[in-house]
């Protein structure tokens, strides 16, 4: 009987030790995972056009980790002619300007043109309608459709708009269709906020990601075009 009692005691002790070890291992694993994530929350105001009919050839790049912004002239090949909006093809091409040296900043995550946003090799999805706060995003969603940037014609030169036929310059650029949904066209050269309150999630090549909530597309006066948003950036160490 004594031997059985001793054996039972040792068995229970081993089980408790195992459970405790598992709990500690899980705690350490969760702690390690949290330590591997570096979370930054910021607000960004990106001025895109201070005066009408300007800055069509500019991109504003932002490093979401530091918040640093840099404005650069579009360096890709420009094609002059008429764009068929139904087919997305250029017609009546009059001239081209070859691609110039890449002038993108060494570090950037997303960039904004007056009418188009793009990512640095990232993919974008829009969180469900029940997700309305950045605080709700603590990890990447398990499902959903991620959309990469797509080739598009970017309007960069409006100088020939009044010619007959109109001949404007377009860059062979890229834009992200999902990220573009923060605004919608409201008329010739006019846009308005769309998907208000929705959270846009961008995942980058290194595994880091950002949750973005757009707040405005003009400045406080309503005269200058800018994109404003709150965001949470999660960097993998």
Where do the PLM segments sit?
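Bacterial N-terminal signal peptides that target proteins for export
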Residues: 1-9
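Bacterial N-terminal signal peptides
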Residues: 9-16
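Surface-exposed, beta-sheet-biased, low-hydrophobicity segments with strongly acidic/polar composition
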Residues: 25-237
